Amino acid sequence: MDVCPLHQCSQQTIDSLLGSVALYKQAYQLDPIQFDVLLRHSQLIEARPGEVVIEAGQIDTWLYFLLRGQLVVYAGDPAVRRVNVITPGEIFGDMAILMDLPRSATVIADVKTRVSVVVRTDFSIFGEPQDLGGVKLPLKLLFYRTMVHNLRWKLEVYRAQFPSHSFAADHRKIRLYAGPRDTVEELVSLDNQARQLAGLLISWNLALTRDDDE
């Protein structure tokens, strides 16, 4: 697996890889200087078939985005149960960093894909929601809105697949923010929503894993 600091890549490579990724494109449009901060704390990964991108049990603060290829998620110890597939455009790795937990699954580059290209950003640079000394409010809001949307989408998928499950409607009980936008108050609310949604998604995963074992 090849890993390269993103800020060391050529501008052409950065533009070709991130130009079509809405999150990074919006980050650049918000503030090119803050975008450079992201680049300095991000890495580009090229994983060949069968190579491990994330290993269950490891502890880190990386937030991942799949740009090209396909990844397969395996659960269990050892990682033998295929539980999900990650396709281009998806965010992953957010639950562990939100809940401050070890990685719960192993993610491997699909053996049917020639190469999988991933960008990962060190989420520790975001600090606590009220800490605006490094990453500024607009960029934090962009990332947290994206994570909340991603988590709600994953939970909606589970709801559609298992409509009679006891967890099916729980994510809809997590209150949306109704106050002034583009404020620290909104950011704090998004952080709270993200943690609750991540916790619920973990509960879903555990429940479905138990069901598979029975």
Where are these regions (language model features)?
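Cytosolic regulatory regions built on CNB/CRP/Popeye-like sensor folds
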Residues: M1-E214
